């Protein structure tokens, strides 16, 4: 049994170092940031270590050399100068009114003013912030460090409420704008968040702020690389493997499949989700830990409102580089926010045309997201969908395709009246979701491009080739399978190949018949 402590929910660097928690050393990259620049912005998904990173910078700039014993920066840094640090954490609050945001910022300013004093003519938030920075510099004789954790949290909580969003925008624009005018007093400024909102002029006013979100040098600043995982947690992975009756290599492969796959820049190594890694090693149970901590309800509602074709999202999206530079709240494109929230990641890059390929990073996110979609697009409750998908897979494994299609009929019959009024594309999307979910348990492919069968499911004994027709017959579906040669790739496989033509009735909004 491992005696090391997992820092789940612990974001304070000093506590982690003093109390013997696991810590993966990122201090060489921090040193590089400190020595090559002064103003930074970094976007990363939630629970990826941004808060711990800022806490580590705070300890560094406060000159707490003893906390860095044995870490890379201990050998790199020789001066260990002490600076006043203003650390603003907007992460753990609820922002439901302009007054609430004002009170939270005012409360933080008051804490700083207790330490550095307050000018009698400083009445606005921006005026007080400016005064604190100036006095901290004057009283200590050292330039000031400003760290802002989750600068965009109020804005994210106001999405969908345009009036509230505009109020927050005005408040934060004035507040963060102080950082430009206070430049002569500042040594280092670092803002982190999930999203880069274009309308908040932190980025237009602070032209010296470097957005390192996509920089290859800092692609591994947050999260865990495979090498870091193996170097740090080898004994713990062995325990995880033993508890799940699998080999060490199988445990690593399963962790990789579930939790790896994030890429925050071009040609980056894969990054593991740190929250899921720590939780699976502590609990010794494979589960969707990161996905369960935040439901993407707002993102799914955006997909529905914009009538975004889910099949494109589920298979991968080509996105121009301009999409990464900002997020406009009034945009009809939900993909930038879905990407920045951690549900999509960079998987490839076309250098000639400057386009990125975005896909789900791993199985935790892929199947967590698709499962979450089911109630929104089918009306089937989360508690029931596992029953449906499990039965679908079992019936195809046993060769009982009639039972599978009969159950699929029942699945569509459960739709509410509102869902039955949906468009033809909606039903195509539902078919798509069903077959994608089956991919958790068996080899299931579903078509998004022409020239292939609508769906192919491979089980140990059978290969099923499906063709669905909405405005045509099951006979026409079978003919298309033959005419297009959809069976040819599987003829030498050795498993029994079964072709199935399925006829979907637009009037009944359900499968009407099928032929084999």
What are these regions (language model features)?
Residues 444-460:
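Catalytic centers of nucleases
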Residues 431, 455-470, 484:
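Conserved catalytic cores of phosphodiester-cleaving nucleases, focusing on short active-site segments
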Residues 1-423, 438:
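Phosphate-binding site recognition
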Residues 434-448:
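A short acidic/basic microdomain associated with nuclease active sites
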Residues 165-170, 470-487:
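Mg2+/Mn2+-dependent nuclease catalytic core
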Residues 145, 462-464, 498:
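Structural motif
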Residues 489, 493-516:
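Domain-level recognition of nuclease-like catalytic cores that cleave nucleotide substrates
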């Amino acid at each position: 049994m491992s005696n090391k402590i997992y820092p789940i929910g612990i974001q304070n660097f000093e506590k982690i170092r003093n109390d013997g928690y696991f810590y993966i050393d990122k201090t060489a990259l921090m040193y590089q940031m400190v020595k090559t620049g002064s103003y930074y912005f970094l976007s990363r998904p939630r629970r990826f270590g941004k808060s711990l990173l800022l806490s580590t910078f705070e300890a560094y700039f406060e000159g707490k050399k003893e906390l860095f014993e044995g870490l890379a920066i201990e050998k790199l840094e020789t001066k260990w100068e002490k600076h006043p640090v203003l650390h603003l954490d907007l992460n753990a609050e609820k922002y439901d009114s302009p007054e609430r945001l004002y009170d939270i910022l005012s409360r933080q300013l008051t804490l700083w003013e207790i330490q550095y004093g307050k000018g009698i003519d400083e009445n606005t938030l921006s005026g007080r912030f400016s005064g604190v920075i100036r006095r901290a510099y004057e009283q200590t004789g050292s330039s000031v460090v400003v760290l802002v954790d989750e600068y965009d949290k109020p804005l994210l909580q106001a999405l969908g409420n345009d009036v509230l969003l505009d109020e927050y925008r005005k408040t934060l624009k004035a507040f963060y704008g102080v950082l430009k005018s206070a430049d002569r007093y500042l040594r280092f400024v670092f803002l982190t968040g999930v999203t880069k909102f274009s309308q908040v002029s932190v980025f237009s006013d602070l032209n010296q702020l470097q957005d390192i979100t996509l920089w290859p040098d800092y692609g591994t600043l947050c999260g865990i690389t495979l090498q870091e995982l193996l170097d740090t947690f080898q004994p713990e992975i062995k325990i995880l493997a033993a508890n799940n009756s699998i080999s060490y290599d199988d445990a690593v492969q399963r962790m990789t499949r579930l939790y790896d796959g994030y890429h925050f820049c071009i040609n980056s190594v894969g990054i593991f989700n740190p929250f899921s890694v720590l939780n699976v090693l502590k609990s010794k149970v494979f589960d969707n830990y990161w996905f369960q901590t935040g439901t993407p309800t707002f993102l799914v509602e955006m997909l529905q409102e914009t009538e975004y074709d889910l099949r494109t999202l589920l298979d991968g999206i080509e996105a121009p580089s301009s999409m990464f530079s900002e997020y406009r709240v009034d945009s009809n494109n939900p993909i930038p926010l879905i990407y920045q929230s951690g549900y999509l990641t960079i998987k490839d890059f076309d250098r000639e045309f400057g386009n990125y390929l975005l896909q789900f990073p791993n199985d935790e996110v892929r199947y967590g997201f698709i499962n979450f979609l089911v109630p929104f697009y089918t009306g089937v409750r989360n508690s029931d969908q596992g029953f449906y998908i499990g039965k679908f897979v079992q019936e195809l494994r046993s060769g009982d395709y009639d039972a599978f299609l009969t159950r699929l009929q029942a699945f569509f019959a459960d739709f509410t009246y509102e869902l039955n009024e949906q468009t033809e594309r909606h039903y195509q999307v539902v078919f798509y979701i069903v077959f994608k979910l089956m991919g958790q348990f068996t080899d299931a492919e579903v078509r998004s491009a022409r020239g292939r069968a609508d769906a192919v499911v491979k089980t140990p004994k059978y290969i099923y080739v499906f063709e669905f027709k909405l405005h045509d017959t099951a006979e026409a579906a079978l003919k298309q399978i033959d005419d297009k040669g959809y069976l040819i790739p599987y003829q030498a496989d050795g498993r029994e190949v079964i072709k199935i033509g399925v006829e979907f009735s637009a009037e009944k909004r359900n499968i009407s018949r099928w032929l084999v």
